């Protein structure tokens, strides 16, 4: 993990909420409950996207709760796993929004993370088969502090908030040089309420180019 993230992590690790959180997760694993993602992949987003290189943040909610899906990046799944419905809808929007985008057969978004897209869930662990089972355990405080740290970054960052949960979280971003893109969640329940046609991926690239940055290659 890069030094800037390491500094933030060390600050959090000294706080009581974080110690309670880690004890909760450790006790879950010790009770033979299956927790996703695996312990060594909980912080993949931070390992792949150094703080100084963050150009875009895509906020998710909590990890996928099926076997072999979650690997520490919001919306992403490991290769060999069928893209879940929300990711399939993200691909559908990309096909309409980005010229030449070809729908992949896999759902691994690592290449986005390596280009400066922080794929951040607001809760970083989940028990197998139980969506939102680790909500209110302390992760929300941790990721609030991540967003507050990102808000302090001098370089402009584009924050992408899909769905009410992410939109509420995105209100932590107040610095005027950042951009926040809000819209409906890509899940099948809400994608037709305005996620399809939102044009966020081309908007991100246009903003990046205006900032003098390279556009994201969304093809995976």
Curated annotation (Swiss-Prot):
Subcellular location: Cytoplasm
Keyword tags: Cytoplasm, DNA damage, DNA repair, Hydrolase
EC primary class: hydrolase
Principal location listed in the UniProt entry: cytoplasm
Biological process annotations from GO: base-excision repair, AP site formation via deaminated base removal
Molecular function as annotated in GO: uracil DNA N-glycosylase activity
Protein name: Uracil-DNA glycosylase
InterPro entries reported in the protein's UniProt record: UDG_fam1, Ura-DNA_Glyclase_AS, Uracil-DNA_glycosylase-like, Uracil-DNA_glycosylase-like_sf
Lineage, opening ranks: Bacteria, Pseudomonadati, Pseudomonadota, Gammaproteobacteria, Alteromonadales
CDD domains from the UniProt entry: UDG-F1-like (cd10027)
GO CC, one annotated term: cytoplasm
Parts forming coiled coils: none
Record-listed E.C. numbers: 3.2.2.27
Organism superkingdom: Bacteria
Stated family: Belongs to the uracil-DNA glycosylase (UDG) superfamily. UNG family.
Active-site annotation: 62 (proton acceptor)
Catalytic activity: Hydrolyzes single-stranded DNA or mismatched double-stranded DNA and polynucleotides, releasing free uracil
Function recorded in the entry: Excises uracil residues from the DNA which can arise as a result of misincorporation of dUMP residues by DNA polymerase or due to deamination of cytosine.
